[in-house]
């Protein structure tokens, strides 16, 4: 799609969002067509909710996020097929795989294990592997990434190349509660089991999060070597584990409760990389 077409879509969707109270399942014409076109572009990976710029900053295409939100007003509840034992669900968003044949999967080039769920408008790149997991609307999962068992990729989240999201990992979405920007995991990161990254935080390229690390916008991320404190962003090539900071003392001067923090214990080295590198045998 040419840039003028995208500009036209953006203009239509911005106008529709300003008048969102008037949008319903009965809405037809230019508004419905524009929202559906935006979702189709997201689904194919032609556009994405956020894009990394040459200077390393991420640009958020807010109009695409708005298109995802508006689609919930347009679509009626309906039967969603594909449950275990021919069970069904009741929802507004169909599966990305609805109507797919073997030819469609071969063309898409990723592997989707039984019980993996991907909602329409999410993009999964060739070479990715989806274990029984959940990928929500508007998300982007890049090539070579594994989304391991019971991991979830939230709405509009951006997952880079050759990332490993371990079992039970949660990557937060943007739709509820509303966030200005999506949660982002950059290329070549390893996110340890049961960790959570939410609220539009960014884990920069090559970083490793140990098991059970929780990072939101208010989480202190402490560099053990320098004492520097980061918020909302893990620096590149960081090895991060769960930790705590001493709390304020009580009025009687007894120690108060410690507070959770994430601790950068070192930068990624060859030893760390050997323990967290992806296995190409699983991506053939």
UniProtKB/Swiss-Prot annotation:
Q: Return the EC number.
A: 2.3.1.117
GO: which molecular function terms?
Answer: 2,3,4,5-tetrahydropyridine-2,6-dicarboxylate N-succinyltransferase activity; nucleotidyltransferase activity
Pathway named in the protein's UniProt entry? Amino-acid biosynthesis; L-lysine biosynthesis via DAP pathway; LL-2,6-diaminopimelate from (S)-tetrahydrodipicolinate (succinylase route): step 1/3
Domain of life, per lineage: Bacteria
The Swiss-Prot or TrEMBL record describes its family as follows: Belongs to the transferase hexapeptide repeat family.
Q: So what does this thing catalyse?
A: (S)-2,3,4,5-tetrahydrodipicolinate + succinyl-CoA + H2O = (S)-2-succinylamino-6-oxoheptanedioate + CoA
> What protein name does the entry list?
2,3,4,5-tetrahydropyridine-2,6-dicarboxylate N-succinyltransferase
**Name of the top EC class for this enzyme:** transferase
One Pfam family this chain carries?
THDPS_N_2
Q: Where in the cell is it found?
A: Cytoplasm
Question: What sections of the sequence does the record tag as coiled-coil?
Answer: none
* One GO location term (cellular component): cytoplasm
Name a single GO biological process.
Answer: lysine biosynthetic process via diaminopimelate
Summarize subunit and interaction data from the UniProt record for this chain. Answer: Homotrimer.
Question: Could you tell me the keywords of this UniProt record?
Answer: Acyltransferase, Amino-acid biosynthesis, Cytoplasm, Diaminopimelate biosynthesis, Lysine biosynthesis, Repeat, Transferase
Positions annotated to bind substrate: 111, 148
The answer to whether UniProt assigns keyword Amino-acid biosynthesis to this entry is: yes
Give the gene that encodes this protein.
Answer: dapD
């Amino acid at each position: 799609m040419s840039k003028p077409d995208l500009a036209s879509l953006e203009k239509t969707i911005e106008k529709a969002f300003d008048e969102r109270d008037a949008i319903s399942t009965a809405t037809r014409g230019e508004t419905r067509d524009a929202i559906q076109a935006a979702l189709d572009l997201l689904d194919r990976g032609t556009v994405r909710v956020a894009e990394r710029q040459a200077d390393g900053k991420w640009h958020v295409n807010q109009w695409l996020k708005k298109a995802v939100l508006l689609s919930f007003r347009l679509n009626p509840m309906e039967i969603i097929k594909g449950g275990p034992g021919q069970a069904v669900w009741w929802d507004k968003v169909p599966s990305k795989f609805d109507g797919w044949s073997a030819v469609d999967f071969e063309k898409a080039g990723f592997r989707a294990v039984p019980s993996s769920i991907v909602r329409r408008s999410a993009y999964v790149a060739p070479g990715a592997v989806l274990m029984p997991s959940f990928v929500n609307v508007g998300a982007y999962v890049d090539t070579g990434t594994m989304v391991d068992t019971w991991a979830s990729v939230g709405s509009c989240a951006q997952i880079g190349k050759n990332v490993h999201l371990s079992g039970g990992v949660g990557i937060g979405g943007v739709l509820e509660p509303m966030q200005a920007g999506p949660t982002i995991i950059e290329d070549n990161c390893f996110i340890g089991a049961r960790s959570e990254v939410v609220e539009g935080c960014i884990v920069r390229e090559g970083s490793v999060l140990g098991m059970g690390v929780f990072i939101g916008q208010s989480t202190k991320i402490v560099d053990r070597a320098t004492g520097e404190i980061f918020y909302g962003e893990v620096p590149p090539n960081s090895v991060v584990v769960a930790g705590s900071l001493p709390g304020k003392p009580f009025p009687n001067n007894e120690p108060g409760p410690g507070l959770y923090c994430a601790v950068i214990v070192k930068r990624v080295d060859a030893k760390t990389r050997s323990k967290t590198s992806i296995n190409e045998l699983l991506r053939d």
